[in-house]
Amino acid sequence: MTNSSSLPRRILTCAFLLLAAGITAQAQTTKPVAPATWQAVLASPRATPVVGAAKGDVTIVEYFDYNCPDCRALDPKVRQLLTSDPHVTVIRKDWPVFGDVSEYAAYCTYAAAKEGKYATAHDALISSKQDLDKKEDVQSVMQAAGFDMKKIDADITQHQKQYSAIVAADEHETDVLGLKGTPGVVINGKVVSGKIDYARLVSLVADARKH
């Protein structure tokens, strides 16, 4: 027999669980953006190459920060997807919400891209076990990955105006798209909200192909 005194507590517990489930379901949504906005995102100048297929049937645009824990957690899932699905294109756009050091890290990858080593720089920074709190931390990671930081920094000094404009444009896109924080993910013109694990990422790509 159920103790009547425990009923209110159980009702409250059930209500809380239902509310939590509703919030989770609502959070895991996709929202289409205007076609012109999506085309502008795809056409905007970049300092780094696309990843995966050059012209895939599904394009994922990720706005990220090298110091963002959730971005670091998402990166291996994206890599796994690219390994299993050769028809996906990934465009990475820097959104250094964690500050100047994150922006410097982005600039380092732009300079590395000119050497044909963007993937090496990106992988080293996004998977770094040490915090990137100072420029010296970024330099240490880059040096360990085989980069000559005098050359990298010279390139950044020479092209800082160009690199800054690219980051500013990417940040403006996040406002236009209504992104709330890193990582910001857009798949074939739909803004993805909520946690993205590997299973959901695969599902989102499959859904994009249907539409």
Task: Annotate each predicted stretch with a short phrase.
Residues 50-51, 132, 192:
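Short clusters of hydrophobic/aromatic residues that line enzyme substrate/ligand-binding pockets
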Residues 2-5, 14-98, 161-177, 181, ...:
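Extracytoplasmic thiol/disulfide redox context detector
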